[in-house]
């Protein structure tokens, strides 16, 4: 692995695929990357950009959530990403990447019961967040939505770590979230990731019930995203202490206070 130069969001790093394991509809791929303080401080909600390579017919960049980071003084630094099953990631393959990018989920200063809400492939950062919150003494509950029951990612470890896991469909997601919040008044904060419209609605449901929320305002499943702030494709309207404005989640987020999205929709 080595760093080769500057990219739109930071240095372009060569990383090596060390392991790819099947996880239902996905493959979890481990990458060996050069050690550094950015990886040591990485947190759930950050992402990577794999630059396009026109010579290989890859015009657009690929954006991937950081699924987990392991820093070991002996074995080095490993970064996990999640890709569709059979995506062609082979052990020994070398890939270029930029990252970790963005602002991830902030952690509560004290242990607090937390609800994590995810839809589709955006559950990837929440998978890591569950483990981090549990290590901080937080009780964790999950609501996960997918169009196909087979599309849920790696449920077994989530069920071992979380106090409860509720599976639903995108159409029923908001109703289930509202029900969980009503039934468990001790839940203090909601973390959400998914399509922008979905996380905005989750934030609104949370706010209406007096819960703080932190949401991923960047949906990596959107097309034509650059991830480095150049394209403007992810621009969104928000209302924050500075007033109404347009923000670029790949730079200011992707994790933002849920009320930013709720107030902008009014």
What are these regions (language model features)?
Residues 2-93, 147:
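Ferredoxin-reductase
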Residues 42, 58-60, 108-110, 228-229, ...:
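Short glycine/proline-enriched turns and hinge-like loops at secondary-structure junctions
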Residues 49, 95-98, 235:
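Hydrophobic beta-strand signal
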Residues 53-57, 98-105, 240:
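Short, charged beta-turn/beta-strand-edge "cap" motif at the junction between a beta-strand
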Residues 66-70, 251-256, 263:
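A short, sequence-level motif marking secondary-structure junctions
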Residues 87-225:
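FNR/FR-type flavoprotein reductase catalytic core
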Residues 221-255:
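Local cysteine-cluster metal-coordination motifs and their immediate loop/turn environment
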Residues 246, 258-266:
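A charged, well-structured terminal subsegment
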């Amino acid at each position: 692995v080595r760093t080769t130069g500057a990219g739109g969001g930071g240095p372009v790093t060569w990383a090596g695929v060390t392991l790819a394991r099947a996880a239902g509809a996905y493959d979890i791929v481990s990458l060996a990357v050069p050690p550094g303080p950015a990886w040591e401080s990485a947190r759930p909600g950050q992402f990577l950009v794999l630059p396009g390579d026109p010579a290989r017919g890859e015009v657009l960049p690929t954006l991937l959530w950081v699924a987990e980071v392991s820093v070991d003084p002996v074995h080095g630094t490993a970064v996990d990403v999640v890709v569709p099953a059979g995506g062609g990631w082979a052990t020994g393959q070398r890939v270029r990447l930029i990252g970790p990018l963005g602002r991830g989920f902030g952690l509560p200063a004290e242990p607090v019961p937390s609800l994590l809400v995810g839809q589709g492939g955006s559950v990837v950062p929440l998978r890591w967040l569950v483990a981090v919150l549990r290590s901080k003494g937080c009780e964790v509950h999950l609501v996960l939505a997918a169009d196909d029951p087979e599309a849920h990612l790696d449920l077994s470890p989530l069920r071992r770590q979380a106090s409860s896991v509720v599976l639903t469909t995108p159409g029923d997601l908001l109703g289930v979230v509202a029900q969980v919040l009503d039934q468990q008044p001790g839940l203090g904060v909601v973390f959400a990731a998914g399509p922008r419209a979905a996380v905005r609605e989750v934030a609104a449901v949370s706010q209406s019930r007096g819960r703080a929320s932190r949401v991923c305002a960047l949906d990596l499943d959107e097309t034509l995203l650059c991830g480095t702030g150049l394209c403007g494709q992810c621009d969104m309207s928000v209302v924050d202490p500075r007033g109404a404005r347009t923000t670029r989640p790949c730079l200011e987020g992707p994790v933002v206070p849920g009320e930013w999205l709720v107030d902008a929709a009014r």
